[in-house]
Amino acid sequence: MAFGIGQGRACASQKLKPKARFDLKIVSFFCLGVLLSGLGAANATGPDGNGAYATGSYRNLFAEAGHSQAEIQHKIDGAFQQLFHGNPTNETVYYPAGSNSNGPLAFITDIKHHDVRTEGLSYGMMIAVQLNKKPEFDALWNWSKTYLYVAETNHPSCGFFAWQARTNGVRMSQFVAPDGEEYYVTALYFAAHRWRNGAGIYNYKQQADELLSRMRHRAPITGSMPMPWRNTNVTVTAGPLFDEKHKMVLFSPSSERNRFTDPSYHLPAFYELWSRWGASEDSEFWKQAADTSRDFFVRVTHPVTGLNPNYANFDGSFVTTFGRSNTNFSYDAFRTAGNWSVDWSWWEKDVRERQLSDKLQAFFESAGTNYGCQFTLDGKQMEPRHAQGLVAVNAVASLAANDPRAKKFVEELWNTPTPDGLERYYEGLLYMMALLHCGGEFKVW
């Protein structure tokens, strides 16, 4: 998550000009990554690939494991009920928050850190549209637009969403975390297709089109932004959320941290959709961004373990400016395997994604049934907690895996209870989306 003012005039878009330890393997790691990435996307038979987008058929890993559709639906419904409408003290992450002129408001909160994040709001919207829960979707979107959308034309985050706020809507950061915008855009397109467009902020397609255009084209803006953790203001220049030259999503568009990326923000399955649904003049860019991310997955993952760091430079090398912990496989990095596996499931354009899932699952199988949740890239465990969110994403990796071991990861997810307590925000949302993916219910709408 990146560092990270009310509604008003829209921001202008302006197009820009076009088992040895890892330290013994670092040279071969990056050389192998560059070599493999040069192979390009493989085995696609047409522009729509061979996956669920082309066939309309989504794998149901739970059914393949022998569970009935009634059991699967019961598990999905139960998890949603608990996380969205359960006991507010120790179960739910979704909280109604009154209403305004646009209707009901609700937020999803990070229980552990007592805040609201675009990550969670946009994940919640995606879950809601997949499950046909329009009231929850609209309430989360209304809260996002009311409290986090930045409309001031002289603000460096203009046209995007401040990534973090208190539960009362007061912003804790004025910066942008692009993974939120990525999920907002895709969830809005799905809502437009599933429910049709309404008026104002509920004209889902218009909202998605405008946000997507800004994500590539918004002109740089320089302004003063508060940094509460430093008890000062700083002058920041920020522009679009994607690097035009490298065709990669940024960790943050702000000038002090826009020269690197977060592997878990790379969502080629979404970029393929944007190339079809967004502005025609941007279609080729999003197609290239999808292929770039597929290459990047190979470059940034360890050639033996399949693990990736939290952050990486555009060439896949380590980002060291935020401390050693972000060169390891940690919480952000949980999600990356899910991203390449869903890309394979929907598009089947790059067979290397299957190899990545096999490597990753082979590593976690070798780590034992109670593997931890933070590792160096060569596999040294840094934290022993067996995280439900990581269990969830490792099951999603089975969508791309070839090896029969994949069934073990699906069955572990099936036997894992819905997260509750202190860790239920991140773990719970990853778990909920994993149930949808593994149950064949996370679809292109």
Segments predicted by a language model, with ranges:
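N-terminal secretory signal peptides that target proteins for export/translocation
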Residues: 1-22
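Bacterial N-terminal signal peptides
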Residues: 27-38
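Bacterial Sec-dependent signal peptides at the C-terminal "C-region" and cleavage site
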Residues: 38-45
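Extended ligand-binding clefts on enzyme/binding-domain cores
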Residues: 45-85, 89-92, 114-118, 153-158, ...
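Internal amphipathic alpha-helical repeat/solenoid segments
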Residues: 65, 75-120, 128-173
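Aromatic-rich carbohydrate-recognition surfaces in CAZymes
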Residues: 114-124, 170-196
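Short glycine/serine- and small hydrophobic-enriched flexible loop segments
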Residues: 125-132, 183-196, 269-276, 338-342, ...
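C-terminal functional modules
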Residues: 379-445
